[in-house]
Amino acid sequence: MRFEGLIGARILKRINRFAVQIDVEGRTELAHLHDPGRLLEIVYPGNEVLVRRTDGPKLKWRIEFGKINGRYVLIDSGLHSDIARRFLPEGAVPEVRVGRKRIDFRYGDDYIEVKGCTLMANGIAMFPDAPTKRGLEHLKTLETLASSGYRSHVMMIITRDDVRCFYPNFETDPKFAEAFLRLVPAYVKAHFLTFGFDGLYLRYAGSIGLCADVGHGTNGRL
């Protein structure tokens, strides 16, 4: 995926979940952050981000990448489905209703839910970085589909290439993490795709697996 017209900026403060005050081109502006996660390791005062202009009525900028450990990581979750689509067969149908819920894609008897991951510790990619009731509901929907004879998938878009394996984040959301490990791979097939940014292109860096050498104690810490 190619990115053009990106401009360097610096975070001043996060106003709310979706608005961030930035210093860009010598001016203080408000930028849209399309990611509901906490992003504490990326979105903090003084950190560098890459932004692009938008035609929004109030927010004239959109944050695309944030810097961490000397590299830029995609933090625009609005692009996750576009990225995932490149790994799905032609004809995959987006935003499919299943009862009162929606799953990101369907292709024949396969249902695919897409999640984005930016959090890493000790080489381990982790999701979520904030409690996600919606994510848990998606897992339950995938379980129901699998029990009905369909094939259920979670595609994790990990927008960094410095990770060796994935593990659900027990410390942040033990309910989601427990459900994830119960369902994967018994009911749900998980795909962990990693990506790196070279300044112009977000490139696929390969797939990783579920960590086999990670445990969690009663306090849920990795």
Curated annotation (Swiss-Prot):
Residue stretches spanning the membrane: none
Single Gene Ontology MF annotation: DNA binding
Pfam short name (any one): SfsA
Gene3D superfamilies noted in UniProt: 2.40.50.580, 3.40.1350.60
Record-linked NCBIfam families: sfsA
Family: Belongs to the SfsA family.
Name of the protein in its database record: Sugar fermentation stimulation protein homolog
